[in-house]
């Protein structure tokens, strides 16, 4: 039962009420959840399951070894992977690229923003939200002074909600794109979808480029893909199984490209 929401809620309740002592098994049980909120869509009692689990994590005194590593990397490098950050430009607007976008994408992103004709400063460091998901507090980066702030990663948008963040799909959805006629299957990420309610803009862009294919379970009912980095590092086998499930359906539907 500990693999299911009810079991994790019971563990959280017992820990918070002193009925259960914290040990590494308890830590592992409470961290073995991506906070994707998919279970909340099926919950008839409307229990805020992700909020309860995440809140309980802040009470934990111990970290999983994989989580300790990303915590150390963030505080040393401002990057959970321990990689070197970069910045580009000095515009009045900012594009918070974050740590999850591949560095090879930098030139593509710069080219797109240059074509729009607006000045952007590109920031590549981690927003830190993965640490909040595992129950760690830290001082938030100051992004005051920018007129607009774009994000490619929904984690960053959630971390900086007070700045009225704009997702790149929202920013580019009104632009024209060259069609390639390929079949694109779109996967709704849990944080862009269930947390931020951004569903249509990515689909609008895909329809301009090629053919949109939907997963059987989509939008607020979309399954999690196993890609949240803090979960994937700690539970790689489970994350891989989730990814295989998504990949299997994409293959069955003859998708050329899986995008999210």
Short names for language-model regions:
Residues 3, 9-164:
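Iron-sulfur-cluster electron-transfer modules
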Residues 187-189:
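Alpha-helical transmembrane segments of multi-pass integral membrane proteins
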